[in-house]
């Protein structure tokens, strides 16, 4: 039996985009910082890293689709923060963002990591953006790095 898995190390020539929503920027800024830290720690070249900002999580799928369609990127790390409020808006935005991101990834068969927080309150979001529960932006970039490696291994 052969075990095939990705490595947590960039080759240094991968072109990566971090796609981040600005809404709830207190959280998404920390996620973005975590993703950038992970990228640097694992051999990424900052000259090959683009940061793309959109107004909110609902806009992430459209711009992800455009980034993947461009053919300029080897992978995209998608970050956002959707925090439940008093209306059904949370349910609609989180469902459509999630479906749209997955759809774009499968449409282009490209590595995409999902670092969009969906939390019940601001405290949970803060915990996942660098406090008690680690930094989900860092984790999303780690996932992308492994996916890039695994896809390359499967291609060879």
UniProtKB/Swiss-Prot annotation:
EC top class named in words: transferase
Source taxon at top rank: Bacteria
Binding site for (2S)-2-hydroxy-3-oxobutyl phosphate: 86-87, 128
Family annotation (InterPro entries): LS, LS/RS, LS/RS_sf
Pathway assigned to this chain's UniProt record: Cofactor biosynthesis; riboflavin biosynthesis; riboflavin from 2-hydroxy-3-oxobutyl phosphate and 5-amino-6-(D-ribitylamino)uracil: step 1/2
Catalytic residues (positions): 89
Keywords linked to the UniProt accession: Riboflavin biosynthesis, Transferase
GO function terms (MF aspect): 6,7-dimethyl-8-ribityllumazine synthase activity
Swiss-Prot/TrEMBL catalytic activity: (2S)-2-hydroxy-3-oxobutyl phosphate + 5-amino-6-(D-ribitylamino)uracil = 6,7-dimethyl-8-(1-D-ribityl)lumazine + phosphate + 2 H2O + H(+)
GO cellular component: cytosol; riboflavin synthase complex
Keyword Transferase set for record: yes
Binding, 5-amino-6-(D-ribitylamino)uracil: 23, 57-59, 81-83, 114
EC number of the protein: 2.5.1.78
Gene Ontology process terms (BP): riboflavin biosynthetic process
Task of the protein: Catalyzes the formation of 6,7-dimethyl-8-ribityllumazine by condensation of 5-amino-6-(D-ribitylamino)uracil with 3,4-dihydroxy-2-butanone 4-phosphate. This is the penultimate step in the biosynthesis of riboflavin.
Entry's family note: Belongs to the DMRL synthase family.
Identification of the protein by name: 6,7-dimethyl-8-ribityllumazine synthase
Provenance organism: Helicobacter pylori (strain J99 / ATCC 700824)
Organism classification: Bacteria, Pseudomonadati, Campylobacterota, Epsilonproteobacteria, Campylobacterales
